[in-house]
Amino acid sequence: MTRFDSIERAVADIAAGKAVVVVDDEDRENEGDLIFAAEKATPELVAFMVRYTSGYLCVPLDGDDCDRLGLPPMYATNQDKHGTAYTVTVDAREGIGTGISASDRAATMRLLANPESGANDFTRPGHVVPLRAKEGGVLRRPGHTEAAVDLARMADLRPAGVICEIVSQKDEGAMAQTDELRVFADEHNLALISIADLIAWRRKHEKHVLRIAEARIPTRHGEFTAVGYTSIYDEVEHVALVRGDIAGPDGDGSDVLVRVHSECLTGDVFGSLRCDCGPQLDAALDMVAQEGRGVVLYMRGHEGRGIGLMHKLQAYQLQDAGSDTVDANLELGLPADARDYGIGAQILVDLGISSMRLLTNNPAKRVGLDGYGLQITDRVPMPLRANAENLTYLRTKRDRMGHDLIGLDEYEANQNTAQPGTAL
């Protein structure tokens, strides 16, 4: 497995005017870009980039700067398969020669990053390609364009970068892949990071949720307060059902009983027997109500372990043909579990929780919530609700996904007498 460097090192290098190597997902471009801050552009940096890349040097900018500098899309209808937002090409109007030299392009790059520059400071077309980054950066679009702007911002520089794809030194005509990029980075003392790690870093260190509303919700389990949140960048709405005083007797939000429940329309609403989601939600509400103090956090956007409702229904078709729940996802070209718990962790922190007892049979959920400043003092098992329809699903969760399902062995021993819908 390729060794990646820390995001902290990459940010420090960007701030110091060095280049870094950034790789994206192998299912996307699967390429590595050299990236440095546009305001730090020098003839030497540009010449180095030209030597080891395709030479098609681009300057990612945020949308406000693109508008201020009069940089419309290169083509009215973007047909790029990855949605790269090319704008019209530019050169600096003054102080350069033809615009193509490393010195000239560095001057144009610095001018693009200069907050005092304006549309009239550039000629069009030119030899530098500005790109429009998506608002929200890599959290909205996991591309090199957004990574460059994010890294510059994180380095307390202007939100403008310089990027270009690194070419292979081993296979003429090809782009460098991850293993070769690691060697390249080491040879030139450059940090090598992944966009996936950059996304994870931002989710961990930045606040991405807003508390929108609160309302009293009487249920058959008792009364809860529904606290509504929205995720800033993907606009997904989540609800925390809160029981009692979260601060608790010590006033520090410690030892709170918490269930982080992934949205499941088929199980939670329609009562599908293919999964145990509905019974788990019901049990969690009951356990928190009996505790008198706790939270059931309902995470939207987690349908089908994060693959979405339509893909989940397609996975059901494959399961009916013999695949298990893990292989069905993989056959669709999707991960076995695409859920991210960073937003959930931020909501729990916002509610004032410092430590919790986590209601789950899934050890991975504990790992997913760890590291966000939350202390998990205990994992409380959820009661099993097995039936003939979800038995294969539960076996797969136990055998392939590591879930601790207390009572499943007993149910299996008696399954010959069980009827569809019979619960344990």
Swiss-Prot record:
Pathway: Cofactor biosynthesis; riboflavin biosynthesis; 2-hydroxy-3-oxobutyl phosphate from D-ribulose 5-phosphate: step 1/1; Cofactor biosynthesis; riboflavin biosynthesis; 5-amino-6-(D-ribitylamino)uracil from GTP: step 1/4. Its cofactor is Mg(2+); Mn(2+); Zn(2+). The record marks H127, E165 as: Essential for DHBP synthase activity. Binds 2 divalent metal cations per subunit. Magnesium or manganese. Binds 1 zinc ion per subunit. Its EC number is 4.1.99.12, 3.5.4.25. GO terms for cellular component: cytosol. Mg(2+) 1 binds at E29. D-ribulose 5-phosphate binds at R28, E29, D33, R141, P142, G143, H144, T145, E165. It catalyses: D-ribulose 5-phosphate = (2S)-2-hydroxy-3-oxobutyl phosphate + formate + H(+); GTP + 4 H2O = 2,5-diamino-6-hydroxy-4-(5-phosphoribosylamino)-pyrimidine + formate + 2 phosphate + 3 H(+). The active site is at D337 (proton acceptor), R339 (nucleophile). Residues 205-424 are annotated as: GTP cyclohydrolase II. Mg(2+) 2 binds at E29, H144. One of its GO terms (molecular function) is GTP binding. InterPro entries: DHBP_synth_RibB-like_a/b_dom, DHBP_synthase_RibB, GTP_cyclohydro_II, RibA, RibA-like_sf, Riboflavin_synth_RibBA. Zn(2+) binds at C264, C275, C277. Keywords: GTP-binding, Hydrolase, Lyase, Magnesium, Manganese, Metal-binding, Multifunctional enzyme, Nucleotide-binding, Riboflavin biosynthesis, Zinc. GTP binds at R259, V260, H261, S262, E263, Q280, E303, G304, R305, T325, T360, K365. Residues 1-204 are annotated as: DHBP synthase. One of its GO terms (biological process) is riboflavin biosynthetic process. In the N-terminal section; belongs to the DHBP synthase family. In the C-terminal section; belongs to the GTP cyclohydrolase II family. Catalyzes the conversion of D-ribulose 5-phosphate to formate and 3,4-dihydroxy-2-butanone 4-phosphate. Catalyzes the conversion of GTP to 2,5-diamino-6-ribosylamino-4(3H)-pyrimidinone 5'-phosphate (DARP), formate and pyrophosphate. This is Riboflavin biosynthesis protein RibBA. It comes from Rhodococcus erythropolis (strain PR4 / NBRC 100887). The lineage of its organism: Bacteria, Bacillati, Actinomycetota, Actinomycetes, Mycobacteriales.
